[in-house]
Amino acid sequence: MCHKKADTGDQFGKWQSSPHAKAYEVLATPEAKAAGAKVGVAEPQKSGKCLKCHSTAYNFTEEVKADVTKVLVEDGVSCESCHGPGKNYKSKAIMEDQKKCIEGGMIYPATTSCTQCHNEQSPTWKADRYTTKDGKKVGFDVEQAAAKIAHPNPKAQK
């Protein structure tokens, strides 16, 4: 798998150590259970209210699930959540060509991808979590958040 190689950026390793990879696990913590209780959820790891943002696989349609057999609810927020199912762009020949990737369904996430979950509806939302460059306190800043999960390939695409 190319996404595990250091010379191409070790995207898998970066994801594995990220909060996204641990998004499902965190639902078992006392903090998550307390947050869930505030919105009427007794078991966060079993509730769609929580899983819709804490697990990519939870959101797959049956059609997509048939194509993506290796993605589990327990995987947390995985690649497909931000980049779309990789079935049609996962080959090396396509991955090396950005235009072909996009034609195959690869998504290069925009702010709206992030704010589907990072928003005021989250029970752990903090309106002052980030400080913008101009000193304003905001609940989410895509530039800072993206920097925390950046996983570029040092080998530039065509």
Residue ranges and their predicted role:
Residues 1-75, 80, 86-109, 128-158:
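Sequence context of c-type cytochrome heme-c attachment sites
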Residues 106-121:
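Repeat-solenoid scaffold signature
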